[in-house]
């Protein structure tokens, strides 16, 4: 079932990207904004990359002194649906629920987390949240919706990176993975003046090759142990309803702990997220609070 869900979500990803939209984790969508509203492309980034504007869906690879790809293990690349072909020793979370000792997968308090913004739908969620929470944002959405990104910050929420354009990382080359991460970091730096500390892989697709690259950026991998599958509300999947999601939330409340995966890239998922927030209440934590660590690697004035 996990493999089928991943295949389905990637197929929807391809459709929405062709329509000029940016797909959210596991299927929900976040529309890209108008170019004239973008975060200005900073001079320091032009000097470093010799480019003058933000990239499209496929960002170019820019070598970095502190990223040594010779230290990355040589593991097979794989695509959605190919889990039976890869070794369990690759420690794939999306295939085998395999986690590394450094991965964050849960929290001692039941807490919501949100992927794929910033997006217009995010604004409604920000107005209703009663506590600090964690947003994992796409770089391409960050530069296209800088005002919404700033609203997230103004309300004191924690922001982590979710790559530049939501690619299935295990299918990419090492250089392409670096590009997805570095451009997302630069987008956050230019828009929010900080260097993120937390990283969530799109689709939860991560193995030890991807981890090795992520760790060289100094990022902490954040996964989840409670999945709402709210993206199925966007795809009109008959196997998931709002009522079923809220029933799961009530069950999870009894456990009083865990990290919930949700999405803020679409109006429908935000509507459910607000109801979930009302059910759980404000006694929730950010990822940094869950593990007793700092919000960002660095902040800039």
Curated annotation (Swiss-Prot):
Cofactor(s) in the UniProt record: Co(2+)
Membrane spanning stretches: none
Top-rank EC class of the record's enzyme: hydrolase
Superkingdom as given in the UniProt entry: Eukaryota
Domain NodB homology: 108-288
GO biological processes: ascospore wall assembly; chitin catabolic process; polysaccharide catabolic process
Subcellular location: Prospore
Signal peptide: 1-24
Binding site for Co(2+): 116, 162, 166
One function term, GO molecular function aspect: metal ion binding
Protein family (similarity comment): Belongs to the polysaccharide deacetylase family.
Summary of the function given for this chain in its UniProt record: Hydrolyzes the N-acetamido groups of N-acetyl-D-glucosamine residues in chitin to form chitosan and acetate. Chitosan is a component of the spore wall.
Entry protein name: Chitin deacetylase 1
Organism: Saccharomyces cerevisiae (strain ATCC 204508 / S288c) (Baker's yeast)
């Amino acid at each position: 079932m996990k493999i089928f869900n991943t295949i389905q979500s990637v197929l929807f990803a391809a459709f929405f990207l062709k329509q000029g939209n940016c797909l959210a984790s596991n299927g929900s969508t976040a529309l890209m904004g108008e170019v004239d509203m973008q975060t200005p492309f900073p001079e320091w980034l032009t000097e470093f990359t010799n480019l003058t504007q933000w990239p499209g869906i496929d960002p170019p690879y820019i070598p970095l002194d502190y990223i040594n790809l010779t230290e990355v293990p040589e593991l097979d690349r794989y695509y959605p649906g190919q889990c039976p072909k890869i070794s369990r020793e690759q420690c794939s979370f999306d295939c085998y629920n395999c986690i590394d000792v450094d991965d964050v997968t849960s929290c001692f308090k039941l807490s919501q987390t949100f992927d794929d913004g910033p997006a217009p739908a995010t604004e409604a969620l920000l107005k209703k949240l009663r506590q600090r929470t964690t947003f994992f944002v796409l770089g391409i959405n960050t530069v296209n919706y800088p005002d919404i990104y700033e609203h997230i910050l103004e309300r004191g929420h924690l922001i982590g990176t979710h790559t530049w354009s939501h690619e299935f990382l295990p299918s990419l080359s090492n250089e392409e993975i670096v590009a997805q991460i570095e451009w997302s970091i630069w987008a956050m730096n230019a828009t929010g003046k900080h260097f993120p500390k937390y990283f969530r892989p799109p689709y939860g697709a991560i193995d030890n090759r991807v981890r090795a690259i992520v760790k060289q950026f100094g990022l902490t991998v954040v996964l989840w142990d409670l999945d709402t599958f709210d993206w199925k509300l966007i795809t009109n999947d008959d196997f998931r309803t709002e009522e079923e999601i809220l029933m799961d939330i009530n069950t999870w409340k009894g456990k009083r702990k865990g990290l919930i995966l949700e999405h803020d890239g679409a109006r429908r998922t935000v509507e459910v997220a607000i109801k979930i927030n009302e059910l759980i209440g404000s006694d929730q934590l950010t990822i940094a609070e869950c593990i007793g660590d700092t919000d960002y690697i660095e902040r800039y004035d």
